[in-house]
C-alpha cells in the first residue's frame, strides 16, 4: 500500500460498494473478500509496526477528542429537535422553502446535459459512511508507512476538528430558524411535535410574522407589545433532573419516557441548516487524505465531495448555501488544527534550521560558548526524544492489542450508528 496501494484499495471499496445497486449478487461476493484481504494485510503489518511508542503518546489526545465529539453530537442532537419543535408542525407544513439558485441550476442542467451524465449525477455513488470508512482506511495505513505516524494522532485531529465543526454548526442553525427544503420533513420525522408554536414563539414571533406594520411598531418600541392571547400549554415530561429539557424538546405523552430515546428516534433533522453536517465530514476526509497521502486518489475524493454536494442540493436535503459554507468551514477548521497532527516531518535538520541565524551570528562574533550551547540544545532534545521512545515490550504489546480491538470496535459502532444518516 505504500506506493499507490492505499488509493487503489479506497477506490476499490467505493466501486464494490456501489455494485449493490448494479449487481447485488456480485456485491455480496466481492465485499467480504475485500474486507478479508484488508483485514489480513493490516493484522500482518501490525506485528512489525515500529511506532507504537508514538501511538501511546497520542492515545490520550485521541480519547479526549472522542469524548469532545460525543459531547458536541449530544448538543447538536438537542438543537436539531429543538429548532424544529419550537415553531410547531403547522409552521413547517405551511412555510415554503427558500428560493435556491443552486437547485434551479441543477434542474436546468438536467434539461441540457446528456441523459447518461444526469443519471451519474443522480446516482448514490458516495455517502456519509463511505467518507468515514475512507478516513478509517487512511488511519490504518500508518502500519504500511503510507501515512506519517502516529495514526491515533491523525485520528485525534480528525475527530477533534469534527467536534468543533459540529458544535459551531449547532450554534449556527439554532440561532436563526430556516424552513426546510423539504416541507414534509418535520411531519415525517417529528410527527408527535405539537402543531402550535412554543409559548415563546407565540409571544415573540407569531404576532409579527406576517404583518409589516406590526414589525415597524416592534422596531420603533423595541418591545413585544402585541397580546398573544391565551397560551396553549405543552406536555411536561418527568425526566428527573433532566426535566428542564422538556421545555426545548416538546415531547408528547407517548414519547416522553426518555429524553435520550427521544433524540435517537428521528434519524436526522429538518431545520439543521446553514451548513451541512454530511458535507463537513466529506470535506474533513478530503483534507485529511490530501495532507496525509496526496496523489491521484486525493483528487478523486475531492470529486466525490463535489458529487455529494450536488446530490445534497438535488435531493433537497440542504440548500446550496449549506454545502458551500460547509466546504470552506471544513477547510479552515482543518487548517487550524494542525497542532494536533501534521504531515510535516520534524527532524534534527528542522531543529538546526530554526537556530541557523543564531548560530551564524554567534560564529561571526566568535562566541564559542553560544555555539556550544545551541548545539547542546539540539543534542539534548534528540536524547529526550529517544528516551521517550524506550517503553517495555510488554507494555507495547498490551497497548497494540487494545488499540487494534478498540479501533475496530469504534469503526463498527460508527458505521452502525451512521447507517441512517
Curated annotation (Swiss-Prot):
Tagged with keyword Transmembrane: yes
Membrane topology: Multi-pass membrane protein
Location, primary (coarse class): membrane
Record-listed E.C. numbers: 2.7.8.-
Pathway: Sphingolipid metabolism
Family matches, as InterPro entries: Sphingomyelin_synth-like (IPR045221), Sphingomyelin_synth-like_dom (IPR025749)
GO terms for MF: phosphotransferase activity, for other substituted phosphate groups
KO phenotype (gene knockout): Enhanced plasmodesmata-mediated symplastic transport through the phloem pole pericycle (PPP)-endodermis interface due to a defect in the formation of the endoplasmic reticulum (ER)-plasma membrane tethers during plasmodesmal morphogenesis and associated with pores lacking cytoplasmic sleeve.
Membrane-crossing segments per the record: 30-50, 60-80, 124-144, 158-178, 286-306, 323-343, 397-417
Superkingdom, natural source: Eukaryota
Pfam family, one: PAP2_C
PANTHER family on file: SPHINGOMYELIN SYNTHASE-RELATED PROTEIN 1 (PTHR21290:SF25), SPHINGOMYELIN SYNTHETASE (PTHR21290)
Function field: Catalyzes the biosynthesis of sphingolipids with very long-chain fatty acid (VLCFA). Required for the formation of plasmodesmal cytoplasmic sleeve during the transition from type I to type II plasmodesmata to modulate post-sieve elements (SE) unloading and symplastic cell-to-cell molecular trafficking at the phloem pole pericycle (PPP)-endodermis interface in roots.
Assigned protein family: Belongs to the sphingomyelin synthase family.
Protein name: Protein PHLOEM UNLOADING MODULATOR
